Structure formats: structure tokens, C-alpha cells
From Swiss-Prot:
The keyword Secreted does not apply. It comes from Homo sapiens (Human). The gene is RSPH1. It comes from the Eukaryota. This is Radial spoke head 1 homolog. Keywords: Cell projection, Chromosome, Ciliopathy, Cilium, Cytoplasm, Cytoskeleton, Disease variant, Flagellum, Meiosis, Primary ciliary dyskinesia, Repeat. One of its GO terms (biological process) is axoneme assembly. Residues 1-19 have a biased composition (Acidic residues). Expressed in trachea, lungs, airway brushings, and testes. Disulfide bonds: none annotated. It is linked to Ciliary dyskinesia, primary, 24: A disorder characterized by abnormalities of motile cilia. Respiratory infections leading to chronic inflammation and bronchiectasis are recurrent, due to defects in the respiratory cilia. Situs inversus is not observed in CILD24 patients. PANTHER family: RADIAL SPOKE HEAD 1 HOMOLOG.
Amino acid sequence: MSDLGSEELEEEGENDIGEYEGGRNEAGERHGRGRARLPNGDTYEGSYEFGKRHGQGIYKFKNGARYIGEYVRNKKHGQGTFIYPDGSRYEGEWANDLRHGHGVYYYINNDTYTGEWFAHQRHGQGTYLYAETGSKYVGTWVNGQQEGTAELIHLNHRYQGKFLNKNPVGPGKYVFDVGCEQHGEYRLTDMERGEEEEEEELVTVVPKWKATQITELALWTPTLPKKPTSTDGPGQDAPGAESAGEPGEEAQALLEGFEGEMDMRPGDEDADVLREESREYDQEEFRYDMDEGNINSEEEETRQSDLQD
């Protein structure tokens, strides 16, 4: 994909005269509306000022790429749309020939990024939509990478926590549409390697999810979740939980199934899906499968009665 951008598609300078039709000023410089065919085969049609592209214009590269938007002294600057040779495109703000400000990038696989850009890279707050799965990352970006507090939203659940180099790290939680949250943390561990990989110096680090607690739904705020802590005193309520000492019957049933660490990647659609087996919760059970990674409740009827009480 063309996310690296138009730095690979340099526009011909106006010193290379080529063919030109249009207005000129008293000094003979290109000025006003004009059309140019440059020696390298590129073309430009639009506004000029004192011999430079300035104002609205359309620059077409001979390889099929084109830019439609604003120029300031030969530089893409302001609002503009760049269509790359592979069909991907960027619509948004430019500064000094770079994607800078707010914009939308449409990738050839139908993924989209909508948000802030800095010096040609995704940087700041932005949303990346994965077209194939419908999942989306909503949160912070640093130098083109998913990094900082964010929310990864899937079809029937979401992960809320912190990311580093596109991987979830530290404390966070999974929020399921059936009405519960699973708290825990991601720990970066070395991936197990086979014999054929023993001599390789590079070590792949993968995040592993360790679940610690199940609670009722709580309001999400875009701040790093704190690691849940237990209390020894009875009768002390923890946020979003029935009690902070011992979990309720539903939470206990869920926790019994996943003692220890699990390989769970928020970006993998089949790794951490909570399936709703039936809308009639009092007749069906939700079970946690160690192989498939499905986190389910033992008796939804019990949870519903607890909520009513």
C-alpha cells in the first residue's frame, strides 16, 4: 500500500520549463491560470503566482498518480486529495508537501484511517477500520504506530487498554456485549521457538493475556485502566463489581476456566470471541474453551437474578 506517501512521487520543478500555455506577469513569469506539460511527462493545470504553482491546481504524474488541491509556492499545502498509482488515496490537510493535520486515507484493501497526521505519518488521535473483519482501533498513534491509550472494537466485544508498537501492553479489560467485563493484563513474553530457529538471534515477543477478574459493565473513559486490586475487608464495594473480596458466582465460574496465561491478540478475530449461544440466557450455558479461546459465563440466569437483586 502507498502509506509511505508521495515522497516517492516528486513533482517536476518549474525550472524545467517544458510546454506552457497561460498567463504571465510583466516579468514573463507564469502567473494566473495556466497549463504545463513538463519534460518528465507530468502535467499541471491550475493557478500560478510569480512562476510557481500557487492556489488550486491538478498535478498528474505520468504513472497515473495525481494530486488535486491547494499549492503554496510549488508545495502541496492546505486541503488536497492525492490518488496513488495503486488506487489508494488520501483526502485531507497538507503542509510543505507532507500529509499534516487531519485527513482520511483509503487503502486498496478497503481499510481506512481517519484522524490526525504529522509529517506524513499517522500521529495523534485516529481511527483505523479493518474492512475484512469490521474491527476498528480507536485511539492514539505515534509515528505511524498504534501506541498509547486506545480501544479495539470487535463485533460483540471490545478491548480497552494501552498499546505499544501495535501490541497491547499492561492492564486492560475486555468488555462483552452480554453484560460483563474481564479484567487482566497483557505481558510481553518470548515466543516459543522450534529447533530450526534456535540459532536465530532475533527473538519474537508476543503479548499474553492474564485474566484476573470478572465484573459488571462500567463506564469507559479514555484513560489507562488501573490494575484491579483485592481487599481483605468485607463489605467494601469495588467499582463495577459486586464485592472486591470474592467475585460473584458468575465471576467465579468464569475465572475457574482460565487460571494462568492465555495467548490472546486483540487483532485476531477468532482468538477471543464471546459467542452468544442463545438469546434465552436461562436455557443455555456459556463455557470457556481453552483451545478456541472463547470466554463465556456459566449461568447467565444467575447473573440476571443477581442484577435484579
